[in-house]
């Protein structure tokens, strides 16, 4: 239904640009809870269960492993940009595990390419986002996967596969290998725009977190908040953002391109 709507909208693009509105050149999407329909808490619980099942039989302590993952993630979120997120994670992980991350990285990549796929069971429904993303790209726009870069590329690729997509379907994907900041730091978004040579005022951001995703509006980005799996622990008034379920927001986005 979205694609049929898009075909009609594409024929009227010029009429939908609006008076003083900047022409949109770039669309950014969050991943978890936005393109992928799942509850973040259920995802994390399943992720920790499966990664523990991978590494505990190899002789690693479960509690230490989970603490290393949590603390490593927390330190990436606080990254000040001096090094890439991967380096922050490596340092924290090595300190707690008393073993260099590089020595375990092969096992981590194997996990993200294989066992991690079982976390797909947390999806609330089977969806295929390929047609939707293609419709946007066919308009000549840049499409960015602006997922919080606390995971390696391999983990993002596996999650994208669940919804019929690949990292190759995007012009840019934020990963812990290529990013120096995390959400909700505005520097995270500034780094994206610098790397893809786009302007915030010519961009749209679609996400489900009222703080982490919507904060980019402070740079002049037009934002859309997905409410299907809304994340809003800060109790931000979401009425100040354009919001709705995924299908509603998808059609709104297509309507202004």
PLM segments and residue spans:
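Asp-based, Mg2+/Mn2+-dependent phosphohydrolase catalytic module
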Residues: 2-27, 134, 148-150, 156-257
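Active-site neighborhood of HAD-like aspartate-dependent phosphohydrolases
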Residues: 12, 16-68
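Short histidine/acidic/glycine/proline-rich micro-motifs that form metal-
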Residues: 35-37, 75-76, 147-151, 178-179
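Residues at alpha-helix caps and immediate loop-helix transition turns in enzyme cores, especially N-
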Residues: 40-43, 47, 125, 155-156, ...
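Short acidic alpha-helix initiation/capping motifs at coil-to-helix transition points
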Residues: 41-48, 81-92, 150-151
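A metal-dependent, Asp-based hydrolase signature
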Residues: 70-113
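Short, acidic loop-to-helix structural element flanking the phosphoryl-transfer center
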Residues: 105-106, 114-144
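Short, flexible loop segments at the rims of nucleotide/cofactor-binding pockets, characterized by
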Residues: 119-123, 152, 180
């Amino acid at each position: 239904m979205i694609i049929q709507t898009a075909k009609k909208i594409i024929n009227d693009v010029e009429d939908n640009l609006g008076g003083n509105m900047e022409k949109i050149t770039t669309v950014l999407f969050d991943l978890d809870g936005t393109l992928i329909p799942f509850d973040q808490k259920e995802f994390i619980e399943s992720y920790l269960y499966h990664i523990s099942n991978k590494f505990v039989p190899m002789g690693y302590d479960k509690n230490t492993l989970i603490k290393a993952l949590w603390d490593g993630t927390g330190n990436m979120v606080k990254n000040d940009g001096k090094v890439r997120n991967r380096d922050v994670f490596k340092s924290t992980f090595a300190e707690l595990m008393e073993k260099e991350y590089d020595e375990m990285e092969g096992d981590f990549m194997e996990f993200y390419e294989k066992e991690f796929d079982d976390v797909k069971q947390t999806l609330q429904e089977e969806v295929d986002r390929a047609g939707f993303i293609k419709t946007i790209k066919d308009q000549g726009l840049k499409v960015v996967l602006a997922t919080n870069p606390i995971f390696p590329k391999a983990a993002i690729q596996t999650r994208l596969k669940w919804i019929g997509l690949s990292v190759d379907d995007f012009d840019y994907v934020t990963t812990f290998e290529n990013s120096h900041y995390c959400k909700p730091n505005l520097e995270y978004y500034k780094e994206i725009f610098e790397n893809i040579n786009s302007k915030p005022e010519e961009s749209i951001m679609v996400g489900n977190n009222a703080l982490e995703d919507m904060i980019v509006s402070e740079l002049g980005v037009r934002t859309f908040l997905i409410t299907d799996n809304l994340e809003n622990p800060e109790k931000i008034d979401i009425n100040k953002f354009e919001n709705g379920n995924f299908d509603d927001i998808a059609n709104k986005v297509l309507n202004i391109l």
